[in-house]
Regions:
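Outer membrane beta-barrel
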Residues: 24-46, 50-177, 212-216
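Repeated loop/turn-to-beta-strand initiation elements of outer-membrane beta-barrel proteins
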Residues: 72-75, 106-110, 163-170, 216-222, ...
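Detector for outer-membrane/organellar transmembrane beta-barrel domains
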Residues: 190-193, 197-199, 204-307
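Transmembrane beta-strands of outer-membrane beta-barrel pores
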Residues: 42-48, 81-85, 116-118, 174-178, ...
Length: 348
């Protein structure tokens, strides 16, 4: 019998890039509920900038409604927006998620809108720490590629519960055609004027499939993502494995990827991510990760880095964090630096 694990899907959608979450329920009754959630964070450090400064990590606010419409079907809708509450201005809010979904214990779950993708269900198992996590999943064009959050996607997921501790899951995703416009700033001569380059990319229909299994706390998965960009087929294979629950005892995850025209348009790349973490009963969680991307044709490392991080849950909804990311070098002549930060995240 096909049985959808709604709790697992909710956790994958909401918590996979954070350590904890909470939401304030503002209405519940007659099979309908409405909740507001999200978090804000601040840190002090050298965080992907040249100087030590106060910064944010990835604050957001969301609103989610659920309605039981009978016959075992629950319809839900969610909107989530990233916050720029330190600088403000015209870009104080940016869309992260926006979808309507329907779930049934046997029939599975269908979602339409901007959402976390089935690809990410497999590829995101190491994308856990607050400050420094899996960067290659968020490379340029990731919304259109569907490598983490996927823009304007139709997805379907279901889980087969083989036994009390064995479950097999699969997911399908589709994105339609679109033309994406991007801008990039450069400074050919320093000092000199800033040059802004605008490029267009034509995305054909894209599809992805994800298959995974959980065997008494040990998970394995495979996902495939493909579709043309301009005249090239941009495709990606990801294999992952993970063990445990992040923040509770031992957690370990490995991600290996092989891409063609997928990561920043490079013809062939390999990508690697490894994470090991240990969560103590007193709320302390310690982790170390490693990540790199290699150009297979030139055998040149695009970037490589490793981070040591500590997160401490003071109380439910309040987490402090500190991390140091070591630059391990590249083979393409780009100047890179170590980064570090310490901060606090408040959930509401």
């Amino acid at each position: 019998m096909m049985k959808l694990n709604n709790l697992a899907i909710a956790v994958a959608s909401t918590l996979i890039a954070s350590t904890s979450a909470s939401a304030a329920q503002i209405y519940s009754g007659d099979g309908t509920s409405l909740a507001v959630g999200g978090y804000v964070d601040v840190g002090i450090g050298k965080y992907f900038e040249d100087n030590v400064e106060v910064h944010q990590v990835s604050p957001r606010i969301n609103i989610e409604g659920k309605k039981d419409i009978g016959n075992g079907v629950t319809v839900d809708a969610k909107g989530e927006w990233g916050l720029n509450y330190l600088d403000g201005g015209n870009t104080s809010f940016t869309t992260r998620l926006g979808y309507i979904g329907a779930s049934h214990d046997q029939a599975g779950r269908l979602v339409v809108g901007t959402q976390w993708s089935p690809y990410y269900d497999v590829a995101g198992v190491a994308d856990m720490p607050i400050a420094f996590a899996n960067d290659f999943l968020y490379a340029s064009g990731y919304y259109d590629l569907g490598s983490s959050r996927a823009e304007k996607m139709v997805s379907y997921r279901n889980t087969l519960a083989v036994s009390s501790d064995i479950a097999l899951s699969f997911g399908l995703g589709w994105q339609g055609k679109k033309t994406a416009t991007s801008t990039e700033q450069s400074q050919p001569v320093n000092p000199g004027p800033i040059v802004v380059t605008t490029t267009n990319a034509d995305y054909d229909n894209r599809g992805q499939i994800a298959i995974s299994g959980d065997f008494a706390g040990f998970g394995v998965g495979y996902t495939y993502n493909a579709g043309d960009i301009d005249t090239e087929n941009a495709k990606s294979h990801i294999v992952s494995a993970n063990f445990g629950s992040y923040g509770k005892g031992i957690y370990a995850a490995l991600v290996w990827g092989k891409n063609e025209n997928f990561y920043k348009g490079i013809a062939q790349t390999y990508q690697y991510e490894a994470l090991a973490a240990f969560g103590l009963d007193n709320g302390v969680n310690i982790s170390v990760n490693y990540e790199s991307v290699e150009d297979d044709k030139t055998s040149k490392t695009q970037y490589s880095q490793s981070a040591l991080q500590v997160e401490y849950t003071i109380t439910s909804g309040l987490v402090t964090f500190a991390g140091y990311q070591f630059d391990l070098g590249n083979d393409i002549g780009e100047d890179e630096e170590d980064y570090y930060t310490a901060g606090v995240r408040y959930f509401f």
